[in-house]
Amino acid sequence: MIRSIRHSLSMLLSLAALALVPASPAVTQAAEAATRMELPAPNKTGGMPLMQALNARRSTKTNYSGAALSAQQLSDLLWATWGANREDGRRTAPTAMNRQDVRVYVALENGVWQYDAGHALIKVLDGDWRGQMGGGSLTLLYAIPQANEWGGAHVGSLYQNAGLYSASAGLGNFVHVSGLHALDGKLPLPEGWKVYIIQTVGLLK
């Protein structure tokens, strides 16, 4: 009887010890890779001259191929939209008093990701939600505090940046509210925040 109890205690202690063993670096890195996507450095030179991009900018609601953007195109699009363009962390789009109180989420085939100022994507939701939000290669979701009276103006600066990049890169884009509430309650938004508007971007047929 005593021997059986000792054996059981020994097994429990062994299991507890295994539970305390930290995951190997390879396992930890694999888990981080599944939830964080480092983007290639954005290409900040070249492209279409500004006046030509303004002339080419338009809304394209149909004729998307559904193919994914390249990693470089995705990087350039997000940097143009809301990337840091100065060492002090200021962005490509202005906000009143530099509050930077806008979040950009990207709905891709492999989930919904939040754009991080360090030029990376952080996964916040699994699944392909693009079909509920206009299709295309991806959909950008712009979230702001509901109490911010300037939030709409801030978002407008961002989606204009995205639209001009799309024109320069030969991509289609359109700003809309179709499927605006598809992810209500699913995104890790701070209290009092909401998705204000969305923008579909994609390769054309």
What does each model-identified segment do?
Residues L18-V27:
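C-terminal segment of classical bacterial N-terminal signal peptides
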Residues I2-L13:
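Bacterial N-terminal signal peptides that target proteins for export
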Residues L69, G83-N85, G111, Q146-N148, ...:
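Solvent-exposed loop/turn segments at secondary-structure junctions
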Residues E109, A117, A143-Q146, V201:
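Fold-independent oxyanion-binding glycine-rich loops
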Residues P188-K205:
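A glycine-rich helix N-cap at a beta->alpha junction
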Residues V27-G136:
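N-terminal amphipathic, basic helical "cap/leader" segment at the start of enzyme domains
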